[in-house]
Amino acid sequence: MADYLLLFIGTVLVNNFVLVKFLGLCPFMGVSKKLETAMGMGLATTFVMTLASICAWLIDTWILIPLNLVYLRTLAFILVIAVVVQFTEMVVRKTSPALYRLLGIFLPLITTNCAVLGVALLNINLGHNFLQSALYGFAAAVGFSLVMVLFAAIRERLVVADVPAPFRGNAIALITAGLMSLAFMGFSGLVKL
């Protein structure tokens, strides 16, 4: 049980996919202008990352490895992610049309989010079992969502802040992301994986 807790905390805080591994930067910068949109994108990405991580592990373990087709791993995982994203898009469209309109083009772009593919590939490379794969996918998604929501809240405050003209927009956003990354580095002594 302690190993699973360490895996969760380590993935969310210490080895955060956005701030440490630099995966998922496109939605991090693109969807984080409004808190509401960032929260919706975080929830959708959490669902997709967790489900894609589980499906990728199952396909790798039950199909690719037994049939000696591991060279198709990346292609198979991309197809799995695309199917999961389409399923998520249908669910969001039915349950929350307002969120579906807010997310716009970013929902289908989860398919190309390198963090989702990164989770699936890292699960295999790290040798995780089924439960560890599910937890790792969920923890990576929670870390992604946490950073997205924090960054969106900061960016909303930066809009009304007195920022010098050369630093307005993406410049101050990148500086803020760098400072957030430094803050998350403080967690590095918390858990050793």
From Swiss-Prot:
Function: Part of a membrane-bound complex that couples electron transfer with translocation of ions across the membrane.
Compartment(s) where it occurs, according to its Swiss-Prot or TrEMBL record: Cell inner membrane
Protein name: Ion-translocating oxidoreductase complex subunit A
Keyword annotations from UniProtKB, A to Z: Cell inner membrane, Cell membrane, Electron transport, Membrane, Translocase, Transmembrane, Transmembrane helix, Transport
Homology family: Belongs to the NqrDE/RnfAE family.
PANTHER family: INTEGRAL MEMBRANE PROTEIN OF SOXR-REDUCING COMPLEX, ION-TRANSLOCATING OXIDOREDUCTASE COMPLEX SUBUNIT A
Gene this chain is encoded by: rnfA
Species, as recorded: Klebsiella pneumoniae (strain 342)
NCBIfam families with a match to the protein in the record: PRK05151.1, rnfA
EC number: 7.-.-.-
Gene Ontology, cellular component aspect: plasma membrane
Predominant place of localization: membrane
Gene Ontology biological process terms in this record: electron transport chain
Transmembrane segments: 5-25, 47-67, 72-92, 102-122, 134-154, 171-191
Top-level division of the source organism's lineage: Bacteria
Entries under Pfam families matching the protein: Rnf-Nqr
